[in-house]
Regions:
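PLP-dependent aminotransferase class I/II
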Residues: 270-351, 357-361
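Short, conserved active-site loop motifs that form the nucleotide-linked donor/cofactor pocket
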Residues: 141, 240, 270, 355-356, ...
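A generic "structured core" feature
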Residues: 168, 172-177, 241, 252, ...
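N-terminal basic, amphipathic alpha-helical segments
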Residues: 2-98, 304-311, 322, 332, ...
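Conserved active-site segment immediately N-terminal to the catalytic lysine
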Residues: 257-276, 297-298, 410
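Conserved core of the PLP fold type I
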Residues: 97-239, 250, 256-264, 338, ...
């Protein structure tokens, strides 16, 4: 029963009040199903009473994450991008690729569909429906080598006249992709429910880029009420769209995974982005995009002449990897491994008096830690770097407006570390902070 209540709270259907109990949030059916008549989409506004107001490393590791002039050898790197690959089914994937080349070599080596291979798209379609509640047909899925490529295809289709609203802090590679392509980017602040729709309305943006299931880097899960408010904003204008980046949504350690925003969209306003970079491996570089049906013809006209950037062999290998059960087994195994590391780091952090607050727990592959020190965030990072410990500061992920805060916040990833490395790294951070002489070194941990 308690788990059921926790799940409803996390999805925003109910809220708890101390010493009083649980109460239902005001979430109603806010819009009707879309009518498609004579090729035009009739949109009906939501009914609501209130409107509230590496390549991969560059995005995950902030503004200085991939500076070639600052190459440092680290003994322990609390990377936000590294995965645990010791238990990956290498033999299974190797067998699949070998058999594909032996049995279908000629077909594999030929050029495939520009939008991705049909059997892979059918497999992804089935997976997304059962795992993320994404509702689509295989024809709506576009395969590409990385989210950045798919974002560029979107820009080519939608045009550069659109303003893009982005959460701040955010995933910086997406920001740079939009900015360098010529779009005007409007940063929108977040509260504990995600992107503030009241501030979004004050911008001229017609596209909102959000991560509702696990916002990077803060780890916020957008509750249902805010999701509906965001959809309400989108249907008010015909050329408004929401780009839902569902990155990192597979790893949730308490309750069930939060369904995708696309699954509750009935007006064709959500463009869904997903990737295998966490669920399989970052080097796979295979992503997928789910377009609303009414955008397929426009995409064909604007981008249909591009060849698919994912080799046919890799597409067929991933398809069989999923169909033969390797993907699901590996994903379940990795959830257990990352949950163990998450719980271990959480327990270790709670031992230290310099840890004021821990945020972003129960999902993803990193934790946010507010540090009790008079030093600046940059001072802490540089002191750790001198001792060959790599940590990451939250300020690196803001687009421009970095709010002043009393205490620095560090992002500590655990995906690629062992428990021994986590414990050693935190103990060494403790010593580093003590050397900064802003607090007494710990000899006895907190009870």
């Amino acid at each position: 029963v308690e788990l059921a209540y926790d799940q409803l709270v996390s999805e925003g259907y109910i809220h708890s009040e101390p010493y009083r109990g649980y109460f239902a949030c005001d979430v109603r059916e806010l819009y009707d199903l879309t009518d498609i008549r004579s090729g035009e989409m009739k949109q009906k506004p939501f009914r609501t009473e209130n409107n509230y107001g590496t390549a991969e490393a560059e995005g995950l590791h902030g503004k200085t994450g991939s500076n070639p002039k600052k190459q440092t050898s680290y003994e322990i790197d609390f990377s936000l991008n590294e995965l645990s690959m010791d238990n990956f089914p290498y033999n299974g994937l190797s067998k699949i690729m070998k058999n594909l080349l032996l049995d279908h070599g000629k077909q594999i080596m030929s050029s495939g569909s520009a939008f991705g291979e049909k059997n892979l798209k059918e497999t992804i379609c089935d997976y997304l429906y059962h795992a993320r509640n994404v509702r689509c047909t295989p024809e709506q899925i576009i395969i590409g080598a990385g989210n950045e490529y798919l974002q560029l295809m979107l820009i080519q289709m939608l045009g550069t006249s659109h303003g893009v609203a982005m959460e701040s802090p955010t995933y910086l590679r997406a920001y740079r992709t939009f900015k360098n392509a010529g779009l005007s980017v409007r940063e929108v602040a977040l509260d504990d429910a995600g992107m503030r729709v009241d501030l979004l309305r004050k911008t001229d943006a017609s596209i909102a880029y959000v991560m509702p299931s696990h916002q990077f880097p803060l780890g916020i899960v957008m509750p249902m009420k805010r999701r509906l408010e965001l959809l309400n904003w989108a249907v008010e204008e015909p050329e408004r769209y929401i780009i839902e980046d569902d990155y990192d949504s597979e790893f949730r350690y308490k309750g069930k995974p939060i369904p995708a925003l696309q699954g509750i969209d009935r007006s064709g306003k959500v463009i869904y982005l997903g990737t295998f970079s966490k669920s399989i491996a970052s080097s796979i570089r295979v992503s997928y995009m789910v377009l609303p049906e009414h955008l397929l013809e426009r995409y064909q006209e604007c981008c249909g002449f591009y060849a698919c950037t994912v080799p046919n062999l890799m597409q067929q290998a991933i398809c069989q990897f999923m169909q033969e059960g390797y993907f699901e087994k590996n994903l379940n195994r990795m959830r257990a491994i990352y949950k163990s590391k998450h719980d271990f780091m959480l327990a270790e952090l709670k031992k230290y008096s310099w840890v004021r607050e821990i945020m972003g727990e129960n999902s993803g592959l990193h934790l946010l830690v507010e540090v009790d020190t008079d030093c600046s965030e940059q001072d802490v990072i540089e002191a750790c770097t001198e001792q060959q410990i790599r940590v990451y500061g939250l300020s690196e992920y803001y687009i421009s407006q970095n709010p002043k805060r009393e205490y620095p916040i560090l992002l500590l990833g655990y995906g690629g570390l062992t428990e021994e490395q986590i414990a050693d790294g935190l103990q060494r951070i403790d010593g580093i902070l003590a050397e900064l002489k802003k607090y007494q070194p710990i000899s006895v941990h907190k009870e």
